[in-house]
Every structure is written in structure tokens, then in C-alpha cells.
Amino acid sequence: MKCFNKLKADYAVLLSFISCMFFMGSCNIAYQYDIESGTEDDTADSTNVTIVTGEGIDVSMYESARVFPGLVDTLVDNTVNTLLALDLSKRYIPAYDLDVQQVPRPIYSTGLYAGAGELITITINDNTMGLTVIIGSHLDDLTDISPYLRLPVVTTSKQLFPGKNTIRNPLGGMIWIEKSKDVNGSADFVMEINGAYRSPDFIVGSTDVTAWVEQLRTTTVPWLELRGRHVAFSVQRERLLDMINDDPIIAEKMPNTLEAWDNAVETYYYNYYSLQVGAQDFSMRAPDFPERVVLDVELLDNLYIRNADYGVVALNTNYLLNELASYQTLKSGNSVAIFNALYRNYSFRDIKSPWWSEVSDAVKAIPLYRMAEKGLREDGYPMGPIFPEEGSSIAEQFPKALAYADTDSSRWFVSDIKSEVRPTYALASLVQLANYKDDDWAFYIELNRMIKDKISIDHSTSTYFFKALCDYFKEDFSPFFEHWGYSLTDEARSYASKYPLMDKAIWKYSPLAENPSSGVVDFPSNGYHYRHNRADWEIYALDANGSDNFNSGQSPDRLLDSDKSTGWTSYYNNDTSTPPLPYYLFIDMKETTDVNGVFLAGNNSDFAATKLIIETPVNQDIINNPLDENIVWREIVQIDSIAHPELPNIKSESFYDFPSKEQVRYLRIKLPEPNRNDNWNETDMSRFRFRVQSFTEFGTFYYKP
């Protein structure tokens, strides 16, 4: 019987429907790339596929098999009787035990393909139990999709027992053997398989490229695997062959491509997350089974890539095949979708993540960036954009990011940097830390190792990460965080102050330069502003009459919370109940402290304070009532530039030295002047609002000898 493997004519309506679905804005698409249809284009001449019936072949679903996954021409390809060796000593360690999201199922590739409806016989000559044969690598059940491009269920599986086992799949498919997760058998187990075809798999380290390309051209087996030590990619033969015909380098570089994938998986995922190949400690053991990517013609939820329990499933397109099979695409950091999917498998569960909001999006791109940087150094490939959704490249944005960090240390990252480029800027900072003193990412590996022992981590702030960083290098990294505008809590700063300041200006490290460290200079510790811990301070806001003076939700304790998105605003109303100036903020530091000056962050609203007078009592005896008229206050310093309208970002900290070091416990901040907006209309709705005062942070600092 002859079958014509040509989908375009038979399924034009379905293809049109799917094309529309891909471009509808309401669709739930995982990534935004230029993805073509997942079905085979078949622009070449039609192929006559001859099927010799009889011999027990089930032909009942040939028409469906012709559509997907394809038919084997029985006059071209012959079935084989072969012995298959499997290492059943490989261990399956559940994802939960490794503190990751997903690990590969214990599935073995066989290099064999079952023809549609053809009987496969598997013989087990010993008492081995716990094995299952799967025919068809496309395990997704697409029942909920309508219309569909293939039958919803195209796989068949059967448990294997000692002796002779038979199985057939009316649609055919690649043959996998899955081991029960708790089985630990012989390293040299052998089974016999009869009636299958050899698939033209490429196996790194054993396949000859020239012979392989010839096999691709002559066989009619429709699917194959590209296999390394840590990866196995199920791809369509015709699509791969078309790609090789267009670019023979794809085939020539296939050994290098799969070796690069193996290195990427082992280095950027396994080792990075503190997993080691073959580790005897199973909680630290990298998966023994390969990371699988299966290309399919259609995915659930109209996605074109998703994480399944057996691997990554991606749409069968030239774009995604190129991510898998092209050496240059991989080494230049353009295999974005596949790397992101692998990250979702190996990242920690959210409860154990150390990454705070300012950098969390950048962390996902670390493996891809490391691959691209390696490709730049080793092969000279220009780096991919890393964050294609930003619409700009790393090469364009990194210099801007470094210029931002190098300007000064009065920064506020989430306010200064546009949201669309924050991941690139944050990634630049993480790369700099990875190369501090030539550490080469070792700190991150140690961080991930430590996390495994934690039940949960508070990543609402950067404190956990910051403390771990300081402990690892035995240095205080506050200057680095300040240059990048990352918020630090007083607790974190106090903790780090036991270490000497970092001695290298690593924020000058330029990752893409020929000599990245050439601009890194020594960082002088003299003159650094060490901030006092304000955790025990008490603060009161009072008006000229001694009454509480703050607006709802904007109490004065917000000035001490290390969060510039909050702050104090004095009470106001639309009538005369807005209290008259001057206003006062009274601070009890709870102990007499050496103070060299104050820092504060302004407010860019119309209520921003314009003048602050910092005072302290002449007598530092215990004060029970800050309104006591017998207390004599003396001025230390006057600040009148906090709300200057031309300052680029008045929410960044500014530091003000005292004329000389003071020993103080109590401070009073006097605000005698109207706010910076002198354009309030004398109407009922705005009258007296010129009195309102507001700023976001206040604290004191000291110098170390």
C-alpha cells in the first residue's frame, strides 16, 4: 500500500487555524519569538512510502500515522533483531530530595523505532522486573485541544516481565525503556528486541558525521534522537535534514554542539546548584538520566514550549530545532527558550530562593549568559540579547549599566532604572560579583550548597544573600550594593561591619571587555559612611503645638525602615486643621553614640521638605518629655538642599557631615520652611498645603579610624 506523506493539502484548514491562534494576543504563549508552524512544510517532492502488509501488521491507523508521527517505508528500511544493553545501576533521585523543581524520568533511549502497527518483541532472559517499554516519545495527551494536528494520544506502553513480551503501537514511534524509580539493577543488563528499525540517532563520541548524514538521507525512519551524556533531543528527521542541507555546518559541528550541551547542563545547572555527577551522597547527586527535549507538532495551552514530567516539550519548528542543533546558536547564547526551560527545572522552590525582587529576573539568565560569554571568548561569536523581550542587546546595555554603577554610591535601583532593562542591569552586577577576585562563580555554587540545608529563606530583602556574600569573602560589600542602588537593611549593614570593607571596586569590572578586570582599582576605605543601626530607635513627629503630626499610613517610623518607597508625611487637610510650622521630629537613639553626620533621602513630591535643622540637647541627660521647655537645644548642622528641584533623583541618599564628631543620644529635626512647591492656589482644596513636609529616610553615620 502506498501512503503519501504530505500534510499541506490535507490539513490546510487546520494549519490556518493554528496560525491564527499563534498571533492572537489573548493566547497564553510562553515566550515571544518568531515561531513558525510546527507541522512539516513538505515543500520537497512527495515521497512514496511503500508499506508491505501482512506478517501481523496492524494497518487500521495508517492514515493517522501518515499524518503523525510518519511512516517507515518497509522496502527501504529493514527491521533488526538486536541486543540492547542498559545500565540499570543508574539511580533516580526525586526532585524534592535534590531541592530542585523537576528531574528527568528514568528513561533509556534505545536507538530503535517501531513501525506503525508492527509487532515488537522484547525478551528478558533473567528475572529483572520493574521495566516498561514506551512506543512513541510524544507523551502529551492533547485530548483537550480541538481541532488538533495529531491524534491526542500517540503513545503505547507496557510493563515488561521475564520472558517474551510483545507490544505494538498502531501509529509507531521511538522506543524508550523506562525503569521503575526504585529499581537498582545490574550495570550490564541486556534485553533482546526484535522487529524494530534503527533510528538515525547521533550519539556523541561514537557516531561518524559523514556516515550519519548519509543515513539521514537514506532512511525513512521519521524521528531520531541527538544524544549526549546529559541530553537527548527527539527531533524530526526531515526537518533536521532540511536544516543540514541549507547549512552543512550543522552536521559538521554536531559533535561539538552536543558536547557543548553536555558541558552547559553539567556546569551551569548541575554544578551550579551544587550537584555532582556520580556523587555518593544522593542529596548532592546530579541526575543519571538525560535532560530530554521532545519536539511535537502541538502543545497544550497553545504554548510552544513547556516543562513536562518527562522533559521539555517544544513545538516542532525550525526556530526551536535551531536552538537545539546549531552550534553557533547555542554558543552565542541564543538558545533562550531551552535554557529558560532548564532553569525552571533546576531553580530552587520559591520558599528557598535567596533572590530578592531587584535581581530575581536576572538570575534566570545566568546559565544562558555564561554560555554566551564562553562562546564570545572561545569562538568569537557575538553574544545574543540574553533578554530578547527587552528589544536591545547585552552589548548595548552592559556599558550603560556599568556607567550607572560607577557614577556614585547614591543610587536607588528600582527608581533609577527603567523596568524593561532592569534584568540586564542586575545581571551585570551579578556577573561582577561572580568575578570578584577571580572567584569564577564559586560563591554562587557555595550559596546554593548552603541553601540545601535551609527549610526556608526570607528573600523579601537582600539580607540573606548579602550576609552570605560577606561571610564567603570575609569582607563588607556595602559599597557594592550602594553603587548599584540595592537596598540594604540596617541589620545587614550592622552584620557586615564586623568585616573590613571590600578592597576592590568590582563595579568597574567590564564583563565584555577584552581584559574585563583592567578598570578594577583598589577601593579606599577611608571616608566611608558606616551607618548606625536604627532598630532600637524611637522617633516622634510633632507640630508646633506638640501634637502628633503625620498623615495616615505615613508615620515617622517609616524614616527608619531602609525602604525609600515609604516615608513620613506631616498631617494635612483641606482646611485650617493643617498645623502651622515649624514641625519637629524627635529621635531617641537609646544610647550615647559617636556620630559624624546624618544621611537622608528626600521626596520628589510637591510636599518635599526644603530645610532641615539638626539639633541636639546641650545636656544629654535622659529626656522623658521632648516638649519640655527647659531643654536647651543647639544646632549642629543646617540642610537646605534636600528638595532641590534640579537634583536628578532626590530619593537617593545624601550625606551631611557635622562640623565635628558629636557624642549624642537625642536628635531633633526642625522643619521651619514651606515645602518646595510655591504654586499652591489659595483655594479651599489646596490652602495651607505649603506647610506639608515629607521625606523618606533619615539616619546617622560614623567614620572608622
Regions found by a protein language model. Give the residues of each.
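Aromatic, loop-rich ligand-recognition surfaces of beta-strand-rich domains
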Residues: 563-630, 650-705
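Catalytic cores of extracellular degradative/oxidative enzymes
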Residues: 222-435
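Exposed low-complexity, polar/acidic, P/S/T/G-rich flexible segments that act as propeptides
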Residues: 181-229, 677-705
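Beta/coil-rich, acidic/histidine-enriched accessory regions frequently appended to metallopeptidases
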Residues: 460-555, 578-581, 596
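Beta-sandwich interaction modules
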Residues: 152-176, 637-677
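Bacterial Sec-dependent N-terminal signal peptides
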Residues: 1-9, 17-65
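Beta-strand-enriched, solvent-exposed domains that form extended recognition/catalytic surfaces
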Residues: 40-200
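Active-site-proximal alpha-helical
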Residues: 233, 395-493
